[in-house]
């Protein structure tokens, strides 16, 4: 198990990961979902328009999912995680997965905060490439808590899932 912490006066962030030994299971590999095909990009949701910072570090391409139970967006990181080193597909995917609560948002961000307090990622294979899609949906309970779940894709197919606990507050 690997654990890394970002510390200032206190722990600001913690990453815990199991480093698993891999073996060849090519002959029995299967995907739960068919690959997602990127369509024409739709406008970024109005509530997120003009928001800079983190959003400037990604090419965000929402998809038309009218009438479907989950929202879909494709992403490509546009900024380096470390200026001098190119990011691996796994590192780029980690930056994208943080967006799931925005992709699956069911609340107006002008009226509500819905901060993800954690992110859990389960991969069934390593991602490839630089473009990743999230198919995300959120649920909000009656007590200020919620959850966003997402299926994660690269351009070749399903990669894994994520879950985020949401802290929901009125603005």
Name each model-derived stretch.
Residues 1-171:
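Terminal targeting signals and extreme-terminal segments of soluble enzymes
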